[in-house]
A protein has these predicted regions:
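Feature captures hydrophobic
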Residues: 1-175, 181
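Conserved class I S-adenosyl-L-methionine
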Residues: 190-200
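Conserved SAM-binding loop of SAM-dependent methyltransferases across substrates and taxa
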Residues: 201-213
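Conserved SAM-binding loop
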Residues: 229-230
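A short acidic, Gly/Pro-enriched loop at the edge of an enzyme's catalytic core
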Residues: 250-259
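A short glycine-rich, Lys/Arg-flanked "PGG" loop and its adjoining helix->strand segment in the class I
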Residues: 274-286
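Conserved beta-strand signature within the Rossmann-like core of class I S-adenosyl-L-methionine
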Residues: 287-295
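Substrate-binding/catalytic lobe of Class I Rossmann-like enzymes that use SAM or dcSAM, i.e.
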Residues: 296-385
Length: 385
């Protein structure tokens, strides 16, 4: 049955969602109802590129209409809808992102959708990254257990974008290539004392101290990460080179020749950007270098992101916020005499990084289930990865 002949059965929520999807013209999404009937969105002349199979029609449209992208994500993890290929569904929405978002609005401002998003927004506001909240926010994600992450991260235990100069490069080598690139940008010497803000499981600090002979002080607020990193340092025999501290960045003291921070600043939040960069300026030695790897958004979308909350912010990284390059420059001007000297964009490598994580995560499914992570958890992380 075609879209035009299929009646609206579930009232205003269905009408709003169908009305929005009808505006999307790229690709071909097939949505199948519980009775077997279906609607087609995008370009019907193209082969079906993504499929949504609804298991509870009424609840699906209610979640999507009331809570926007957050509702759709939570509906997936709750089994309200399914798909043979979650990446294809998300790719279809990305393909139509311009129609969904325009040039300066967030995905939570879809016309007529997300009617109750204010409840998620208030919840997000309560998770602002104060010293106490930061520990809670980080713990919820990174303290799922070192065994959990070791089952699907590569051997370096790196949880950030790798650098694939060659798309066929082995994952571990691509992560090591990223570390080497950062060391090169930092112009590391054996006499340097390096501060790593957000040291994770110790991958970069281990590489830098062993390869360049420099001293590294790594700070984290994750108890699990600190435990793993300290054991790693001892195992590698670099106790005299690499020190791990459980410490909030706001409490860092001393002076360092170089600073590095790898995809940690996303956990700082708009309210605390100035304090973050002011602290970096305070502890960086004269003529020092600060290498910052971060996930960015276009400048024209940053402001809108500060006023909304998406599924990842609610479910995966509470309190998080992506920055734009313009936002970084704005804060640097207000807080320090630091300036942007070199900018490299390797965001395209995140495609390969996520592909590796997704495949490795699902390959470890049986082991993860034995750790008492249930099917809902698996669906949540599949949606994320």
């Amino acid at each position: 049955m075609s879209n035009s002949k299929l009646p609206i059965k579930y009232g205003l929520p269905e009408r709003l969602v169908v009305g929005l999807l009808n505006k999307l013209t790229k690709g071909h999404l097939k949505v199948t109802y519980t009775d077997g009937s279906s609607r087609h969105f995008g370009n019907p002349d193209e082969p079906v590129s993504a499929a949504v199979i609804i298991n509870n029609d009424d609840e699906f449209f209610r979640r999507c209409a009331y809570y926007g992208n957050v509702g759709m994500g939570e509906a997936y993890t709750d089994g309200i809808w399914d798909t043979p290929d979650i990446r294809a569904v998300i790719s279809w929405f990305i393909l139509n992102m311009q129609a969904l978002q325009g040039t300066d609005t967030s995905s939570d401002k879809l016309p007529g959708v997300g009617l109750l998003k204010i409840f998620n927004w208030f919840r997000h506001l309560r998770r602002a990254n104060t010293v106490d909240n930061s520990r809670q926010n980080i713990s919820e994600h990174y303290d799922l257990g070192n065994e959990f992450y070791s089952l699907w991260l590569d051997a370096t235990m790196t949880y950030s974008c790798a650098k694939f100069q060659d798309p066929n490069l082995e994952f571990e080598k691509a992560q090591t290539a990223k570390y080497e690139a950062l060391c090169h940008k930092l112009k590391l010497k054996s006499t340097d004392h390096v501060l790593e803000i957000g040291c994770g499981w110790g991958g970069f600090g281990t590489y830098a101290s062993k390869t360049y002979g420099c001293k590294v002080t790594g700070v984290t607020i994750s108890e699990e990460q600190a435990k793993f990193a300290r054991e790693r340092v001892k195992r590698e025999g670099i106790e005299d080179k690499f020190e791990i501290l459980i410490q909030d960045y706001r409490h860092i003291k001393g002076q360092f020749d170089k600073i590095v921070s790898i995809e940690m600043i996303e956990a700082v939040g708009d309210r605390f950007h100035q304090s973050f960069f002011a602290k970096c300026h305070e502890v960086l030695a004269p003529n020092g270098i600060f290498a910052l790897q971060m996930i960015t958004v276009p400048d024209n979308r940053y402001k809108s992101l500060t006023k909304g909350v998406d599924w990842i912010q609610k479910v995966i990284f509470p309190g998080s916020l992506l920055l734009s390059v313009g936002r970084v420059n704005e804060v640097l001007l207000k807080t320090s005499d630091l300036f942007l000297h070199d900018l490299e964009d390797f965001g395209a490598f995140y495609v390969h990084t996520l592909e590796n994580w997704h495949e490795r995560f699902n390959a470890a499914k049986d082991s993860l289930l034995k750790l008492e992570f249930d099917e809902r958890f698996m669906r949540t992380w599949n949606y994320y990865l």
